[in-house]
A protein has these predicted regions:
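Short beta-strand element of the alpha/beta-hydrolase
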Residues: 63-76
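Serine-hydrolase catalytic-loop signature spanning alpha/beta hydrolases and amidase-signature enzymes
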Residues: 76-79, 101, 156
Length: 196
């Protein structure tokens, strides 16, 4: 019976400790517009890549550091940024749970043709052309640039792990729409032969 009570107490201690990454119990601090890289965009313009970083300020981080979550916005590789839609919410929600979080911008844009896509919507009986077309290769290039920039953000954060108290062996990527594709490519595309 004594062994059973000890096992139950140990199990309860593990459950209580596991709540650290679940409950939104921490106060947070956020630093905006940190430059994590300088790049050339699709049109040859030089750009600075920015990120927002958020972390708990009243926690006791593990000796190895906090888990890191990188949030990547969507927008069809043409629009969006680190301050819109879901990434700001993910940034604060996960920091309140004990994570160090970052929301990143990545290079947007691609060359478009003059051809238009008919969206099967008619205005007063006339088909409406709602989008300009891009060559498929432009979508691949936009996707690849996004992945390169996300990997740059990841390198920046790992190189600053001590400063932001990050565990470089405990990293998560999350994205919406195009950001989801960028997150997947960042995690899994690691061989040059896999380049689209």
């Amino acid at each position: 019976m004594r062994k059973l009570i000890i096992i139950i107490l140990i199990f309860q201690a593990v459950i209580i400790q596991a709540q650290k990454w679940v409950d939104t119990s921490y106060q947070i601090e956020q630093i905006n517009d940190i430059v994590y890289g300088n790049v050339v965009d699709f049109a040859g313009n030089e750009r600075s890549l920015l990120m927002n970083i958020c972390y708990p300020k009243n926690d006791l981080p593990p000796r190895c550091g906090r888990p890191l979550l990188i949030a990547i916005h969507g927008g069809a590789f043409l629009a969006g940024n680190k301050d819109t839609e879901s990434p700001p919410r993910w940034l604060t929600d996960f920091a309140k749970r004990g994570y160090t979080t970052a929301s990143i911008n990545y290079r947007l844009g691609m060359f478009q043709t003059n051809a238009e896509v008919n969206c099967n919507i008619s205005a007063f009986g006339v088909p409406w052309n709602c989008l300009n077309m891009q060559d498929t290769a432009e979508w691949y290039r936009g996707y690849y640039r996004g992945m390169q920039d996300a990997k740059g953000a990841l390198r920046f954060l790992v190189n600053h792990a001590a400063e932001y108290q990050i565990d470089p062996k405990n990293i998560f990527l999350v994205g919406e729409s195009a950001g989801g594709f960028v997150a997947l490519a960042t995690a899994f595309l690691d061989d040059p032969t896999e380049k689209p």
